[in-house]
Amino acid sequence: MRILHIWDQAGVAFVLAKYQRLKGHDSKVIMVREYDKYGIGKFYNQYVIDATLADFDQKSFDEAHSADILHIHSRSDMVFKFREEFGNSKKIILQYHGTDIRGIKKQKLPHRSKLSDLAVRGIFTYRRLRDLILIKKRIHTKAQRLADAVIVSTPDLLPLVSKAIYLPNPIDTDHFKPDKISSRPERAQALTMDTEAIDIQLTLSYCKKNNLKLDIDVYNRIRDPIMYGDMPAFLKKYRLYVDVRYVDGKILENLSKTALEALACGLDVLDYKSNRRHGLPVEYDPMNVTSRLETIYSR
């Protein structure tokens, strides 16, 4: 099977391509390298077709001619373009990952410099306007009708998409795995991440309200991105990952991708109900996820 992933979100497309190849498929990802903030595309370089924003559409069409499956991540606009170009000769899959369908009212700035904040604010403004246009013109609904299947990466997205199929995020267990011998240095007991979408003050208030007496490191991933290749070593400096996340004032019930990666590395994870979890659940094993995806492709 020849599979072309269009765009990537949080490394999901790259991990799928890697394990699809291990299962004997010809799978690759076309992505704009300038958007590779965390070095994920660089880490999975052998699976990447590099493009610029200017030539992304044309390169996507060129590569799509030889593909059986066009698996589009977030870019619902590409569904129309591919269906118009190829009619029903290609199977088109649309996958949503979170804010691409849920939306977000407010995003934080990295505060590296005034120039940086100005540039990032411009990007945020563009995204909000783009999302408003997509909703107003019912682009998402139309794209979902044109796709052969629509996938969501977390269960909370199911009510937002008619006839959606939930597919767990695959975690690269070759990359995220426990050390054979524990050698964690003495430092803060727990870790949590401050990201563009998260209200970290609500997270800390939650911990205080629930009497969670933890020594927590709050890492600002907006200002200081951690490269994907370095992420396992960084996580394994801690024993517990606090995965309590508020977006637009609402607590998220699903485990974040970082929390899943922490579980794969051997950390405990504190979820939104203050439950401690240990061990990566089997549904996130990449071979299991790709097997489930094959059944979606074959429908």
Predicted regions and their residues:
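Membrane-proximal helix-turn-helix segments that form the acceptor-binding/catalytic region
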Residues: 59-65, 100-103, 111-149
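Conserved catalytic-core segment of nucleotide-activated headgroup transferases in glycan assembly
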Residues: 172-228
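Conserved donor-binding/catalytic loop of nucleotide-activated donor transferases
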Residues: 236-238, 258-268
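Nucleotide-sugar-dependent
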Residues: 243-260, 270-274, 278
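Donor nucleotide-sugar binding/catalytic pocket of nucleotide-sugar-dependent glycosyltransferases
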Residues: 130-178
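Short N-terminal targeting/anchoring amphipathic segment
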Residues: 1-7, 60-79, 93, 240
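Short beta-strand->alpha-helix junction loop in the catalytic core
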Residues: 33-35, 100, 156-157, 167-177, ...
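A charged, aromatic-enriched C-terminal amphipathic alpha-helix characteristic of glycosyltransferases
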Residues: 275-299
